[in-house]
Amino acid sequence: MNLHQTVEHEAAAAFAAAGIADSPVVLQPTKNAEHGDFQINGVMGAAKKAKQNPRELAQKVADALAGNAVIESAEVAGPGFINLRLRPEFLAQNIQTALNDARFGVAKTDKPQTVVIDYSSPNLAKEMHVGHLRSSIIGDSISRVLEFMGNTVIRQNHVGDWGTQFGMLVAYLVEQQKDNAAFELADLEQFYRAAKVRFDEDPAFADTAREYVVKLQGGDETVLALWKQFVDISLSHAQAVYDTLGLKLRPEDVAGESKYNDDLQAVVDDLVQKGLAVEDDGAKVVFLDEFKNKEGEPAAFIVQKQGGGFLYASTDLACLRYRVGTLHADRLLYVVDHRQALHFEQLFTTSRKAGYLPENVGAAFVGFGTMMGKDGKPFKTRSGDTVKLVDLLTEAVERATALVKEKNPELGADEAAKIGKTVGIGAVKYADLSKNRTSDYVFDWDAMLSFEGNTAPYLQYAYTRVQSVFRKAGEWDADAPTVLTEPLEKQLAAELLKFENVLQSVADTAYPHYLAAYLYQIATLFSRFYEACPILKAEGASRNSRLQLAKLTGDTLKQGLDLLGIDVLDVM
């Protein structure tokens, strides 16, 4: 159920009874549970509009809520706020419904969409580095939530598998194989660096590399076969990282830049024919009045270089047209570094004008900030090199395993390693997903691996604590009527019933930290409930009801963490 929507519906009916049906309710959870569960903040605005006393108008609304089946009490506070407390019977009934539902009371959207989500999308011919972490895990979490809410999600890994760097790499590979017939491409990163040194220092080699670019773009079979070697090994490296992270990205989700090669000229010609692209100094340019510089000149969105070469803009236009026209997207999401914001705004504007992006199709740039080191600079190794993602994840597992062994010295090596992997990978992902994605954040091993505070280990431990209760509980009646008498029982019940609303917010806004914050709230509330309301020592209806709340807490934590791409453990 959508608790927020249900309460808002009751409040709207009370607004109508008070003669202010056209005014928005403005419903929010209370900041202090002692004041109730929700607060109506819309009366002041309505009173100003109707030229009435806000407290008197608020009292009319509160009176209209008397005897309500959902709301137990409505009290006017301050200049015209109304604090609402929900009926325990209403909460209890909905807890029962959620417990008997495989989706824990979360309804699917009544307006399902086909959502194409572009995320991860590393440049190939190099191993993935920490800069690829945010797009990969943010995109994965958003796609999981959208899917869970009933949408059809098409994941697109728009890898950089085309461009001038491949001419350089092919030239170096040919050179190496000439000197050593048994040469194999093992260390991708080392190979790329060596090829770059040759390209920068040897003009003759650079000329050869450029010739290979021409051959590659011309479809030369021998060069294409060598190019495919780089693509295949790069993708296998990437897939290994995705599997370690537990992402849902699969090889069939790869749709690289090369996929759109045959469409690029057609797109440029179409833009010219529609009068959108014009020639400017030999290049084809779309001038956008919506993006003017300080001098008032329209921004130049270049779609074809002087000499006929193509750019990211050309590929992205062809790609967007394909996603709408062939994949039939209702909504497009691009999970990309925030520094690309202007490019995507211009891409969307150009696409709207060209008719590639109809008004009934949504398109959003899902930007994110930078992962920083403790020194406040982008996260690097001590020597200043980019950190390989695989090395970061290996270190996460090693650190977590050491921590697990320290806390549980009696654990066998295999069990400690299994728990260590779940905790370590979960910690890295949650440290990112729990932050507002638009912000930069500091990567801190000690903070993210802590079992206290807003961390994955804390939430994972909260789940194991629930499982521990049920290992000791023995027989109990899961179908017994739920009875809520203690304040923390009601508070926990009300919070558990907000799950659908939170997930809908994530689906609408593409902000996974809303879900992380909710799960942390559930875990901390359960901890307080656990201390204040003995579960196993309680008797009769109270014992069953508290076990029901514990069961739904565990289910919600497990499902919620899964939607963030994080595993749980029964024991840790």
Curated annotation (Swiss-Prot):
SUPFAM superfamilies found in the cross-reference section: Anticodon-binding domain of a subclass of class I aminoacyl-tRNA synthetases, Arginyl-tRNA synthetase (ArgRS), N-terminal 'additional' domain, Nucleotidylyl transferase
CC annotations in GO: cytoplasm
The record's annotation in InterPro entries points to: aa-tRNA-synth_I_CS, Arg-tRNA-ligase, Arg-tRNA-synth_N, Arg-tRNA-synth_N_sf, ArgRS_core, DALR_anticod-bd, Rossmann-like_a/b/a_fold, tRNAsynth_Ia_anticodon-bd
Where does this chain carry the motif 'HIGH' region?
A: 122-132
Leader sequence range is none
CDD domains in the record: Anticodon_Ia_Arg, ArgRS_core
Top-rank EC class of the record's enzyme = ligase
Could you tell me the keywords of this UniProt record?
Answer: Aminoacyl-tRNA synthetase, ATP-binding, Cytoplasm, Ligase, Nucleotide-binding, Protein biosynthesis
The organism sits in which domain of life? Bacteria
Describe the reaction catalysed, as an equation: tRNA(Arg) + L-arginine + ATP = L-arginyl-tRNA(Arg) + AMP + diphosphate
Q: Name one GO molecular function term.
A: ATP binding
Give GO BP annotations, semicolon-separated.
Answer: arginyl-tRNA aminoacylation
- List all disulphide bridges recorded for this chain: none
Q: Where in the cell is it found?
A: Cytoplasm
Which SMART domains did the record assign? Arg_tRNA_synt_N, DALR_1
Q: What is its EC number?
A: 6.1.1.19
- Oligomeric form and interacting partners: Monomer.
NCBIfam families for the chain: argS
**Designated name of the protein:** Arginine--tRNA ligase
Which organism was this protein described from?
Neisseria meningitidis serogroup C / serotype 2a (strain ATCC 700532 / DSM 15464 / FAM18)
The taxonomy runs:
Bacteria, Pseudomonadati, Pseudomonadota, Betaproteobacteria, Neisseriales
